[in-house]
């Protein structure tokens, strides 16, 4: 009798555990959308090209939007297609707030460490995407944004 009770307990535990594992993927999907949106934003390839510019110009950041756009255009259509980019100008516009990104050029950019090089003007829902010259994009609230970009307007 005792053996039968143990088998029943084990069977119930196995069922509950399996149901719990099945529920995990669907229960934690909220952050996945934000992460996917961040990774697919125009800001990521823009920041990667910015970092490549620094790497190919002895640590000097681009002096202007024109200089960065010319550098990106020179990469060629195959390189751009790798980022799903067909129009260089579209890289400079946020798909979330439909405004041009603020990009730090010349003396405003500090190469040599992973530093913020571009960010959304307004963002969405009280958060903004910011990017560093390594191509990392983060979604931050206003307080964290002010810490990371103290001179922002």
Predicted regions located by residue number:
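Sec-dependent bacterial lipoprotein signal peptides
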Residues: 1-26
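Conserved hydrophobic/amphipathic alpha-helical signal-anchor segments
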Residues: 27-97, 102-107, 137-153
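Short loop/turn motifs at secondary-structure junctions and domain boundaries
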Residues: 119-123
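Short loop/turn microsegments at loop-to-beta-strand junctions
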Residues: 125-127
């Amino acid at each position: 009798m005792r053996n039968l009770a143990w088998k029943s307990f084990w069977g119930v535990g196995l069922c509950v555990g399996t149901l719990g594992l099945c529920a995990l993927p669907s229960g934690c999907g909220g952050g996945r959308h934000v992460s996917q949106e961040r990774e697919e934003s125009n800001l990521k390839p823009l920041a990667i090209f910015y970092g490549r510019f620094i790497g190919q110009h002895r640590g000097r950041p681009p002096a202007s939007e024109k200089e960065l756009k010319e550098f990106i255009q020179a990469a060629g259509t195959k390189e751009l297609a790798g980022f799903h980019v067909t129009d260089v100008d579209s890289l400079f516009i946020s798909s979330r707030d439909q405004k041009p990104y603020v990009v730090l050029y010349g003396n405003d950019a500090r190469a040599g460490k992973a530093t913020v090089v571009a960010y959304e003007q307004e963002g969405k829902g009280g958060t903004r995407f910011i990017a560093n010259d390594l191509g990392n994009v983060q979604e931050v609230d206003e307080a964290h944004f002010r810490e990371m970009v103290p001179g922002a307007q």
